[in-house]
């Protein structure tokens, strides 16, 4: 079937289980007996037909199929000769000639999308949410989920931002007892107390000791023998010449 039609086929739907792959109808189910257009898909081990309503067939698909079959739709399009209704056959040929499906077929598919959306809303409102008590928990759940997602997005990434270490705060000691206050005051008085005469005596003793040490050193130096002075020679009287070797 795929070989004869080169991967394209038209037929009346045998069941109502197939879902339309087009977007005009909002991917609604193709009803039994509705005209549908199929594309054969061969992906390795899997081979299948992808169906869409005739009103969901786009201008691009019609143009590509007509180009591939070189305008011979009657003999090349698979399933065309199996259609017993001449009105349906004429509709197909007219679409390939004008480059788009009839407006009524496209409008019918748009209505399917609108009806499907309204039916879905009706089931949600009347089927699942029949009372205000059931609506409120779901609304609260949506709000809490949204709030959690916002909080999660606001948390900084620990991998990219280093943690800052807090420096320890200085400890402050509070003296509440009078005894501790007096001890602190006495310590300050001792630190600021001026030096007395006794301390001066101690300094004088240290100075005297240092003077004694220096005197001892000087006596030792004075005990060393002094060099005798060179005797002066009067060269004029002796008649000898002056020489440094003497």
UniProtKB/Swiss-Prot annotation:
Residues 157-168 have a biased composition (Basic residues). Keywords: DNA-binding, Metal-binding, Mitochondrion, Nucleus, Phosphoprotein, Zinc, Zinc-finger. The modification Phosphothreonine is found at residue 130. It is found in: Nucleus; Mitochondrion. Residues 103-246 are annotated as: Disordered. Signal peptide: none annotated. The keyword Kinase does not apply. SMART domains: zf-PARP (SM01336). Residues 103-126, 185-196 have a biased composition (Basic and acidic residues). A zinc finger (PARP-type) spans 8-99. The modification Phosphoserine is found at residues 131, 243, 245. Pfam families: zf-PARP. One of its GO terms (cellular component) is nucleus. Residues 175-184, 197-215 have a biased composition (Acidic residues). GO terms for molecular function: DNA binding; zinc ion binding. This is PARP-type zinc finger-containing protein C2A9.07c. The lineage of its organism: Eukaryota, Fungi, Dikarya, Ascomycota, Taphrinomycotina.
């Amino acid at each position: 079937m795929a070989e004869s039609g080169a991967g394209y086929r038209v037929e009346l739907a045998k069941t109502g289980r197939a879902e339309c792959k087009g977007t005009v109808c909002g991917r609604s189910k193709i009803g039994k007996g509705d005209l549908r257009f199929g594309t054969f898909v061969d992906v390795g081990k899997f081979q299948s037909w992808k169906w869409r309503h005739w009103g969901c067939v786009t201008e691009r698909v019609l143009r590509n199929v007509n180009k591939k079959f070189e305008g011979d739709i009657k003999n090349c399009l698979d399933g065309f000769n199996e259609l017993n209704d001449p009105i349906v056959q004429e509709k197909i040929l007219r679409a390939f000639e004008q480059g788009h499906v009839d407006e009524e077929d496209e409008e019918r598919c748009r209505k399917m999308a609108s009806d499907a959306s309204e039916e879905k809303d009706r089931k949600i409102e009347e089927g699942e949410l029949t009372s205000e008590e059931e609506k409120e928990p779901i609304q609260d759940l949506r709000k809490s989920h949204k709030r959690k997602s916002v909080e999660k997005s606001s948390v900084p990434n620990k991998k990219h931002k280093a943690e800052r270490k807090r420096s320890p705060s200085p400890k402050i000691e509070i003296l509440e007892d009078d005894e501790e206050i007096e001890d602190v005051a006495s310590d300050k008085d001792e630190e600021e107390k001026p030096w007395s005469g006794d301390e001066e005596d101690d300094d004088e003793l240290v100075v005297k000791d240092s003077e004694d040490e220096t005197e001892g050193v000087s006596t030792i130096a004075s005990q060393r023998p002094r060099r005798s002075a060179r005797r002066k020679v009067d060269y004029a009287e002796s008649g000898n010449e002056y020489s440094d070797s003497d």
